[in-house]
Amino acid sequence: MCSLITQLCDAGQLADYVGLGWLNAVSSQPYLVQALGLQPPPRRVDVDAAFRDAEGLHGHQPWVATPLPGRTVRALFIGINYYGTSAALSGCCNDVKQMLATLQKKGLPINEAVILVDEDNFPGRTDQPTRDNIVRYMAWLVKDAKPGDVLFFHYSGHGTQCKSRGDSDEKYDQCIAPVDFQKSGCIVDDDIHKLLFSRLPEKVRLTAVFDCCHSGSIMDLPFTYVCSGGEQASGTPHMKRIREGNDVLGDVMMISGCADEQTSADVKNTATFGTGSTGAGGAATQCITCMLMNNQSLSYGKLLIETRDMLKRKGFKQVPQLSASKAIDLDQTFSLTEMFSVDRSVQ
């Protein structure tokens, strides 16, 4: 079936990611065994150059779904297994398959998708997830976005930290590791923020999922979910401003696999999560996609709580985080396409 799907993509036809997401995959070792550790500060991204490089780039339509009239839907998927290196993982490309399958089954009408993975026979693959490609396609994702448009971003791979360059109050910057990070360096949270948000207009909806270590604040968004009495406590959840000066015009929400100081785990057999998939994959991606598929009317708050609870029941210590560009009304029904209702009591 894998070869059939690849042949269909090569022939310009659409891949069945729902079917692909349910295929068997090779078992893996946990991400935790292969944590990268502290990395040297990388060179900064030239954001203007990235947007120039994004001119003329295009994605492909991954499936046919009922369109959103007058609105464009773009998506960027990144999965990196670091094949043949000391940093090798096994489940990250499977995470992308699982996320694609989930969005296809939910009927998200993606007009253009870009898939950056280091798995050569991945159906619909755009290119390798090198530093240069990730940077230019981040710019592509938001380039020319207009009010009403919908954007989706998914990253599964290594996340790590580097010492801050001193331009923030934080001791460490969070960063993601491209497939060529040992040669070209990582991409820090400050640059991720600038690439995705510096030119994002109002009333654009962007959802991001980061399944990697040290990802809690990797987008440097100003508001985060908190719960009185601790992250797993039963107190009243609410949004809290944690940053000044990082305001974003668009409606952006990120779910990360863990807090900044934590690592994100892999599982050898994702069948234990009941998502329909098997083989290696990220625990956070499996829980998030399970929640999206099996609960049609979850609120933003419940989506995070249920994801955390599922991980805890299965013995994982990581605590997924929710951050946003605005103080989301956590009782609002979660949507990939609709703008936020805002909790006006949060300043």
Curated annotation (Swiss-Prot):
Q: Which UniProt keywords apply?
A: Autocatalytic cleavage, Calcium, Endosome, Hydrolase, Metal-binding, Protease, Thiol protease, Zymogen
Query: What is seen without this gene?
Result: RNAi-mediated knockdown causes no defect in the growth of the bloodstream stage form. Simultaneous RNAi-mediated knockdown of MCA2, MCA3 and MCA5 in the bloodstream stage form causes a growth arrest resulting from a block prior to cytokinesis; DNA replication and mitosis are normal. Has no effect on VSG protein recycling. Triple knockout of MCA2, MCA3 and MCA5 in the bloodstream form causes an initial slower growth rate in vitro which reaches wild-type levels after several weeks of culture. Triple knockouts have a normal growth rate and virulence in infected mice.
- Site Cleavage: which residues? 268
Gene Ontology MF, one: metal ion binding
Q: What is its main location?
A: other
Q: Which superkingdom? A: Eukaryota
Record InterPro entries: Caspase-like_dom_sf, Metacaspase, Pept_C14_caspase
Q: Its Gene Ontology biological processes?
A: proteolysis
The EC code for this enzyme is 3.4.22.-
Which residues does the Swiss-Prot or TrEMBL record annotate as the active site? 158, 213
In its record, the post-translational modification comment is: After processing, the propeptide and the large and small subunits remain associated by non-covalent bonds. In vivo, the unprocessed enzyme appears to be the predominant form.
Keyword rRNA-binding in the entry? The reply is no
**Activity regulation field:** Activated by Ca(2+). In response to calcium binding, the 280-loop, the 280-loop, a disordered loop consisting of residues 269-275, undergoes a conformational change which stabilizes substrates in the active site. The binding to the substrate triggers the release of the N-terminal region resulting in the activation of the enzyme. Proteolytic cleavage is required for catalytic activity towards large protein substrates.
Q: What class of enzyme is it?
A: hydrolase
Q: What does this protein do?
A: Cysteine protease that cleaves specifically after arginine or lysine residues.
Q: Which family does it belong to?
A: Belongs to the peptidase C14B family.
- How does this chain assemble? Monomer.
This chain's protein is named Metacaspase-2
Species of provenance? Trypanosoma brucei brucei
Which gene carries the instructions for this protein? Answer: MCA2
